[in-house]
Swiss-Prot record:
Segments of this protein annotated with the region Disordered: 1-22
Biological classification of the source: Bacteria, Bacillati, Bacillota, Bacilli, Bacillales
Keyword Membrane part of the UniProt annotation: yes
Segments passing through the bilayer: none
Gene: yabP
Descriptive protein name: Spore protein YabP
Keywords linked to the UniProt accession: Membrane, Sporulation
Domain of life: Bacteria
Keyword ATP-binding belongs to the record: no
Biological function: Required for sporulation.
Organism this protein belongs to: Bacillus subtilis (strain 168)
Induction and repression of expression: Expression is sigma E-dependent and negatively regulated by spo0A.
Amino acid sequence: MNSYYDQKGSSSVPEQHDVTMKGRKHLDISGVKHVESFDNEEFLLETVMGMLSVRGQNLQMKNLDVEKGIVSIKGRVFDLVYLDEQQGDKAKGFFSKLFK
């Protein structure tokens, strides 16, 4: 089983992870540990279940609650993709280099 399902971390972010989309225009995501990067076309989020890429058009962060691990995104959503551990490391490396 994936290590994300087995880990019980001591962080303040709840271990539960939910994604709620309303009409492809509004996303509420819980279980977010860290916002790796974001712009108007893509958000890269580290969640308790792994790296999550949200791609779309005119994306905006409407709410960020660090203590509860909740992110709200507004805009036209094209896709949501969970990256496996190897892809997540590659994506993090790419974005880390890009935004240094």
